Swiss-Prot record:
Top-rank taxon: Eukaryota
Alphabetized InterPro entries for the sequence: Transthyretin-like, Transthyretin-like_sf
Chief localization: secreted
Keywords, sorted A to Z: Secreted, Signal
PANTHER family referenced in this protein's UniProt entry, alphabetically: TRANSTHYRETIN-LIKE FAMILY PROTEIN-RELATED, TRANSTHYRETIN-LIKE PROTEIN 15
Keyword field contains Zinc: no
Identification of the protein by name: Transthyretin-like protein 15
Source species: Caenorhabditis elegans
One Gene Ontology CC term in the entry: cell surface
Transmembrane intervals: none
Family the entry assigns: Belongs to the nematode transthyretin-like family.
Signal sequence interval, chain numbering: 1-19
Length: 130
C-alpha cells in the first residue's frame, strides 16, 4: 500500500514538473443580424479527467469587441474553446443562447482573431438557457 502511495505521489510530482504554461489570446467582434452587440465571452480549456478550466471572461464592449488572454499549465497541448452567451434571435423572454467555438490548436501561443462572430447563425453546439 505504501509503495502504491509513493508511486502515485512521484508520478503526480513528475506531471507537475513536465507541465508547461501555454497561452492563447482570442479577439473578435460579436454581430447579430448585421449589428454589433454586447455579449458575455468566456475562454475555457477542456480537461478530460477534471472539470474544464475557466481561463478568462469579459463582457464585449458596446461595439461588440472583445479580447481575452488565458494561460494554463498542461503536460499535453491545451484544448481552448470560447463560450459566448447572448440574446441574438432568442424568442423566449429572459432566455439566452450559449454558443461554443473551438479554437484551432495552431493558434496556441499566439492570437486567434475571429474577426466577426456572427451569432445569428445557429450551430449544432448552440443551446438555449432559460
Amino acid at each position: 500500500m505504501r509503495a502504491l502511495l509513493f508511486t502515485s505521489v512521484v508520478l503526480l510530482a513528475l506531471a507537475f514538473v513536465e507541465a508547461k504554461k501555454q497561452t492563447i489570446t482570442v479577439k473578435g467582434t460579436t454581430i447579430c443580424n448585421k449589428k454589433r452587440i454586447q455579449a458575455e465571452v468566456t475562454l475555457w480549456e477542456k480537461d478530460t479527467l477534471d472539470p474544464d478550466d475557466k481561463l478568462a471572461s469579459m463582457q464585449s464592449n458596446k461595439e461588440g469587441e472583445f479580447s481575452l488572454t488565458g494561460s494554463d499549465d498542461e503536460i499535453t497541448s491545451i484544448s481552448p474553446y470560447l463560450i459566448i452567451t447572448h440574446n441574438c434571435n432568442v424568442k423566449k423572454a429572459g432566455c439566452k443562447r450559449v454558443s461554443e467555438y473551438l479554437i484551432p490548436k495552431e493558434k496556441i501561443g499566439g492570437t486567434y482573431d475571429m474577426t466577426y462572430v456572427t451569432l445569428d447563425i445557429l450551430s449544432a453546439k448552440d443551446k438555449e438557457k432559460c
